[in-house]
Amino acid sequence: MTESQRIGQLFNVGLENDRLDAASRKAIIGDHFGSVWFRAKTTIGVAGVRKVADAVQALATDATDGVDFFVAANQEGGLIQALAGPGFSTIPSAVDQGKLDPSVLEGRAARWGQQLIDAGVNLDFAPVADVVPKGTEAQNAPIGQLRREYGSDPVAVGKHVVAFIRGMTKVGVATTAKHFPGLGRVEGNTDFTSAVVDTVTTAHDPYREPFARAVSAGVPFVMISLATYDRIDPDHLAAFSTKVIHGVLRRDIGFGGVVMSDSLTADAVSEIAPGQRAIDFIDAGGDMIVLGPIAVAVPMADALAKRAASNAAFRARIDHSALRILEAKDAAGLLPCSG
């Protein structure tokens, strides 16, 4: 792979609505972006999504040196279900999933995962591992208000998180534990506001239990939140924090997989130049940059290339992150040599 192709592997870019348009096709080929996601809800069903996913995979020869794409979606359930229509089940919210016995949830997750596989989707931005304290749901905009949490007890939530991961893994869907180190005790939603601050969570917080269980279960991706955690690193958003990524997630919990950003086109980071967002995330130890409009990825990729050209240590970070992503793709059978 060339340096630009390795940089491209670091990006998971949003598709426009439910299609692969000409501008997206051009950007994916030109900047070698290695993963995509359905960022808008669609009701075109399994067959319609499969048509789009197949069109993306057909770009691999020209875009990514023959390496297939992670094709992703937010398929949590409840209000957060991107893919619907013929062939897709209506997935209950995590609150309702949390009422199921974990063994039952595992079976249902396998069924939902098979629908994703049939649609050509091989990566789910789920499960949510955030814990919302009982009685605070209405004040918790990103998770509790939307019924995205499995519950209020970290141990019980962890069991359901693992069940979801195991069910999806059985049928070949990679999963993402999110939003580390937790959005269950904030009020603002980082998608729509900046300066979201958690004043409670600590580096050894009991509410990190679901993430630790997910890591022990082999989850390949962990998504980092865009909130600030005053008691871990008050000076940086979590996605830009070495203390959060290296100190807590990698060193303390032992995660060796792909660290994924929450969307770096969210309002929480809107005041930071796109290129700087990408640099700060990789500098902090992140691997895969998730973002919405694909046009924003172009200046991000340019910024990474310029920094790598003048900084050997940063270039090594890029190469290490690209390797982690390629290892995840190998595990998912997406490399030409995957057995």
Predicted feature descriptions by range:
Residues 8-15, 34-38, 69-75, 123-127, ...:
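Hydrophobic faces of well-ordered beta-strands that scaffold small-molecule active sites
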Residues 27-46, 125, 140, 215-235:
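Short acidic, glycine-rich surface-loop motifs adjacent to enzyme active sites
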Residues 1-30, 81, 271-339:
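Preference for extracellular/luminal or secreted protein segments
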Residues 1-82:
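N-terminal hydrophobic targeting/anchoring segments and the immediately downstream early-domain regions
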Residues 59-88, 108-135, 157-181:
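Glycine-rich, aromatic-flanked loop segments that form ligand/cofactor-binding clefts
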Residues 2, 47-57, 155-309, 313:
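Second-shell residues forming the walls of enzyme active-site clefts
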Residues 98-111, 155-158, 204:
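Glycine-rich anion/phosphate-binding loops
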Residues 16-20, 41-45, 75-80, 123, ...:
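Solvent-exposed loop/turn segments at secondary-structure junctions
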